[in-house]
Amino acid sequence: MAKKNIKQKKDNRIAIDVKKHIKKVDVGVFDGTFVFTSPLSISELAPKLNKSPNEIIMRYFKKGVVYNLNTILDEEQIGELCLEYDLDFKIEKNVNTENLLENIYFDDLEIDLVARAPIVTIMGHVDHGKTTLLDTIRKSSITASEAGGITQHIGAYQIIKDNRAITFIDTPGHEAFTEMRARGANLTDIVILVVAADDGIKMQTEEAIDHAKAANVPIIVFVNKMDKYEANPEKVLNQLSAKEIVAEELGGDVVFVKGSALKNEGISELLDSILLIAELNNYKANPNRLAYGTTIEANLDKGHGPLATLLVQNGTLRKGDYLVVGSTYGKIRNMFDEYDNEIEIALPSKPVKVSGFEEVPTAGDKFLALADEKQARAIANDVKQKKMRLERAMLQSSDIRTKIANGELKNINLIIKADVQGSLEALKGIFSSINIEGVTTTLIRSAIGTISESDVRLAQTSDAIIIGFNVRASRIIKDLADSVGVQIMNYDIIYKFKEDLELWMKGTLDPIIIEEVIGEAKVLKLFKHSQVGTICGCRVINGKIKRNALVRVLRDGIVIYNSKIATLQHNKDSVNEVIADKECGLTIANFNDIKENDIIEVYIKVEKKHDEVK
């Protein structure tokens, strides 16, 4: 039987014009304005300003600052210099395929735009009920939680209220996830700030407020745990008012909803408030475009390979689309909604799980659907090349490398493998939060997936510790690591890793030398001896003094000499130590200018680890 010709439906979605987005900025003075893109060295800047390098160097020299041709001036310095030359200045950005995804813009006509679901981010302090609230909204009994009691991974979900969709982004609640929360706020239209009525605002509450303000988005405050006996909503209102989050009932413009996520109280009112704000702000997108959006989460899935949760921000995503996501690309093989139902299309504001990537994407990366695979691959490769250049530049940082080589700076090499991108990002964020003078950490490799032979071999050659977060090494890999002396550390709680890293960093430093005073003696009488010099007749006034111990000679409370005890006698017998309230005779090495009533302070030097020093 002859096969019927099945007519493929034409794809009318508009593709991004990549060439139109590419922009090369001409650096120079135009109509009294100096246009530039980034920090410049004096040798690069001078001709662009129509000045000689020596003139600029002399200008700084007169201010008491010594610069040379290779000195890099930052954007602020260049701006100040322009003003000194009576020039306006303007900072523009070169756009090429390496940074294209961060610089996508849309020139859609109003007629092409349609209403989309509001994107809502739930934020708040740990244990104030964010996850419970989200689970109650979804009418789900499943709460994904970390071993340490922290929501493990960012998730995105869509629910329906009165036939209208609302998309929620859930962000972890602990301080280690500050960057992840910040990224969530940048994606969002509305922030729900969860504050426990029995606890009030806390550190993460204030951080969330800062992120919401920075993103310039409306805030709805959900005063949770109103079912608690200790609930004090007035306290919460007053605390937030002090942070310029003023409730409508106090004359402000912020919606406050009081309720209990645990008992499903106030939830309907909260959703109504979201829909009202969405209606007032008229959120729109153009579904007739190839999709553009942001990676919420990514991991290596056993069944599907590299898997990413994507949030469509504009356009429509379809199964079979070619995507570039940061430094990787692929063709959508499978697409699932938040309930793991396989779907064919995703409209604006829809979160979906997508498989088909060459590598695991990075959470926070922008994605773009393109008309063909060749273009997607080319852009991804350019982004990857830029990433590799930056990594090489970091490794070749002469300042750090020189200090390490000279022993001025201690270093710990780490290889991190994690279950999902969100965990990896949080672990990497730990590095920047720990600042211990004299020691640094170098991240040799960080990736999603199990610990491999390649990781062990790299750790062996780079003298690195392997960190596995929610991933384990097989018995074969463990045996290999043991045989070559590579240490593998496993964690499932972020802050246990932080504590250990701090201990490792302190442990690499040379011990701190602490001086401990063990005794004091007062000089009562002096005796001159032709062979040994001045002998001090002393009484030990506290502690004890020991032969060969270090001493400070104090006169009227001022140290006049540092030396050590050369000889020590008690009742004409040579002894090793003399205790308090006993008299003794002693000599001080290389010092004879001692006087009666001088105090001899005896001390020892003790090595202590950095974590032992308060």
Swiss-Prot record:
Listed binding positions for GTP are: 124-131, 170-174, 224-227
- Recorded GO MF terms: GTP binding; GTPase activity; translation initiation factor activity
Name the segments for region: G3: 170-173
Write out the ranges of the annotated region (G4).
Answer: 224-227
Q: Which UniProt keywords apply?
A: Cytoplasm, GTP-binding, Initiation factor, Nucleotide-binding, Protein biosynthesis
Q: Which SUPFAM superfamilies match?
A: Initiation factor IF2/eIF5b, domain 3, P-loop containing nucleoside triphosphate hydrolases, Translation proteins
Entry keyword Cytoplasm: yes
Residue ranges for the region (G1) are 124-131
Task: Tell me the segments the record calls region G2.
Answer: 149-153
Q: Which PANTHER family match?
A: TR-TYPE G DOMAIN-CONTAINING PROTEIN, TRANSLATION INITIATION FACTOR IF-2-RELATED
Q: What is this protein called?
A: Translation initiation factor IF-2
Q: Which organism is it from?
A: Ureaplasma parvum serovar 3 (strain ATCC 700970)
